[in-house]
Curated annotation (Swiss-Prot):
HAMAP family assigned to the protein according to its UniProt record, in alphabetical order: UPF0391
Organism (species): Methylobacillus flagellatus (strain ATCC 51484 / DSM 6875 / VKM B-1610 / KT)
Entry's family note: Belongs to the UPF0391 family.
Residues annotated as transmembrane: 6-26, 30-50
Location within or outside the cell: Cell membrane
Keyword Transmembrane annotated: yes
Protein's name according to its UniProt entry: UPF0391 membrane protein Mfla_0947/Mfla_1091
Length: 54
């Protein structure tokens, strides 16, 4: 699960880059939302992975 969240976070970063740079102005809002959603998912997965190993 952590592996997938990192992959989706990278995809969100790429989408955010295109959205924030004006290349795809129509998709900027979607990229911003995806960036923060996957950032939260990544943090939750990292914390869950740390506590699961104990």
């Amino acid at each position: 699960m952590l592996h997938y969240s990192v992959i989706f976070f990278v995809i969100a970063l790429i989408a955010a880059f295109f959205g924030f740079s004006g290349i795809a102005a129509g998709a900027a809002e979607i990229a911003k939302i995806l960036f923060f959603v996957f950032l939260i998912i990544t943090i939750v997965s990292l914390v869950a992975g740390i506590f699961h190993k104990r």
